[in-house]
Amino acid sequence: MSSKLSKKKLKSLEYRSKKFDKKSQSLEEHEKKVQQKNEELEKKAADKISRDELPEKQLAQSNDKDKHSVSNPPHKTLKSKRQKGKNNDRKVILFVGNLPKDSSVETLQLHFKRAGQVPSVRIPTDKTSGRQKGYAFVEFINPKTDVISKALKFHHTIYKERKINIELTAGGGGKTEARMNKIKEKNRKWKEEMRQRVASEEQQAGEEKMARKAVADEGLESGIHPDRLRLLQ
């Protein structure tokens, strides 16, 4: 009986031993799994921190680029601003007719410089022969108040032994019907003013001539030289 009990005990002990070994193995595996999981969590946390830091670096780099672009703007941007400024300029273009065929930009600029501003000049030429067409366009950019009125007074002045004609054009401000009518009205008024000015100058010149003649006649009658008579008067 005792031998049988001992066998049972032995089997029980073997069973318990195997069970314990299994438990120990499962415990080790569990510890390994826990350790792996912790490592994975630590790795994820480190990746998240690096991802959070990356936008800050990128933002700092972006700010540096913005500062650089503000302090040193690209040439293209400056060019577009200059172009925009040019588009906002006020332009007044005069038509100049009855020009000789040997006209030049420089001599026309000198002729109109007396108005108070040097204009840009364009002299159209024939496409086939290359000869001048006998007229030009004189352009004033942002002219001062009295520049255009002075330039218009060069109408019928002499340029290279030619009496030139000057008129306002619709250039530089569009060619709408309202603007064209306005230009026509301005030209009409200006021509009327020119006619009155010429008549006034002719009248004044005639009066001065008559006055000189009267002085000369009086000098002859009195026996005194006309120049001396003017001084005495």
UniProtKB/Swiss-Prot annotation:
Subcellular location: Nucleus, Nucleolus
Any single GO CC term annotated in Swiss-Prot or TrEMBL for this entry: nucleus
UniProt-listed Gene3D superfamilies: 3.30.70.330
MF (Gene Ontology): ribosomal small subunit binding; RNA strand annealing activity; RNA strand-exchange activity; rRNA binding
SUPFAM superfamilies for this protein: RNA-binding domain, RBD
Gene Ontology biological-process entries: eukaryotic translation initiation factor 4F complex assembly; formation of translation preinitiation complex; ribosomal small subunit biogenesis
All residue ranges annotated as the RRM domain in the record: 92-171
Key words, A-Z: Nucleus, RNA-binding
Highest taxon in the source lineage: Eukaryota
Signal peptide span: none
Region (Disordered): 1-90, 194-233
Chief subcellular location: nucleus
Basic residues: compositionally biased ranges: 1-10, 76-85
Record-linked Pfam families: RRM_1
InterPro entries associated with the record: Nop6_RRM, Nucleotide-bd_a/b_plait_sf, RBD_domain_sf, RRM_dom
Name the record gives this protein: Uncharacterized RNA-binding protein C365.04c
Native species: Schizosaccharomyces pombe (strain 972 / ATCC 24843) (Fission yeast)
Classification of source organism: Eukaryota, Fungi, Dikarya, Ascomycota, Taphrinomycotina
